[in-house]
């Protein structure tokens, strides 16, 4: 039980630190730039996927009467609504989610889609709103990212903030990052 409490506490602290109060997306990192307290400007798709999957896990494994379950549900609803606004026409999310110039990315899309599915199954996300978003993501992954030989397209090649020096972690560094 202490490990469950610790895990939930860490997930909520991550949201408290990285959630953008304006668009409710998560920023990627703190401490990778010259200023160790600076938070990256971007809203990295894989980072948002890892965040919401933590909430999805809590919803699956905590009892519903646990106050942490209710908190995870509230945060998932807010984050899922934010993410749905930025899904592309092809059903994917961009590497830097809120930037129309960023390329579409498969791994963040997969993490987000899985989490939306859990939210729907657990009764936290309204199926009439989020099932079309989930279906569009699955179709986008199938159409644009997965090949018959199981190779993939549009995936991030690393996890560190792109860029060097003062440009590290900036939106420009993300836009210039090479696709893998």
Give the role of each language-model region.
Residues 26-46:
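Acidic/Ser/Thr-rich, low-complexity mid-to-C-terminal regulatory regions of eukaryotic proteins
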Residues 52-97:
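Oxyanion-binding "anion nests"
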Residues 1-2, 50-68, 111-125, 180:
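Well-ordered alpha-helical scaffold segments within catalytic/enzyme domains
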Residues 4-28, 73-91, 133-150:
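Long, well-ordered core segments of solenoidal/helical folds
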Residues 4-8, 41-45, 49, 66, ...:
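Non-membrane alpha-helical structural segments and their capping/turn regions in soluble enzymes
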Residues 21-24, 47-55, 84-86, 109:
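A structural motif
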């Amino acid at each position: 039980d202490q490990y469950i409490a610790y895990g939930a506490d860490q997930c909520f602290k991550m949201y408290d630190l990285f959630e953008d109060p304006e668009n409710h997306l998560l920023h990627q990192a703190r401490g990778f730039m010259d200023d160790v307290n600076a938070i990256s400007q971007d809203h990295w798709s894989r980072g948002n996927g890892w965040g919401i999957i933590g909430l999805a896990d809590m919803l699956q494994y905590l009892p519903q009467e646990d106050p942490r379950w209710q908190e995870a549900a509230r945060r998932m609803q807010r984050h899922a609504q934010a993410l749905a606004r930025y899904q592309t026409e092809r059903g994917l999310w961009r590497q830097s989610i809120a930037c129309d110039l960023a390329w579409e990315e498969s791994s963040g899309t997969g993490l987000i889609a899985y989490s939306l599915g859990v939210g729907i199954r657990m009764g936290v996300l309204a199926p009439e709103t989020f099932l079309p978003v989930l279906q569009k993501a699955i179709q986008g992954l199938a159409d644009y990212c997965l090949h018959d030989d199981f190779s993939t397209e549009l995936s991030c090649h690393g996890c560190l903030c792109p860029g060097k020096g003062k440009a590290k972690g900036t939106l420009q560094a993300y836009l210039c990052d090479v696709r893998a």
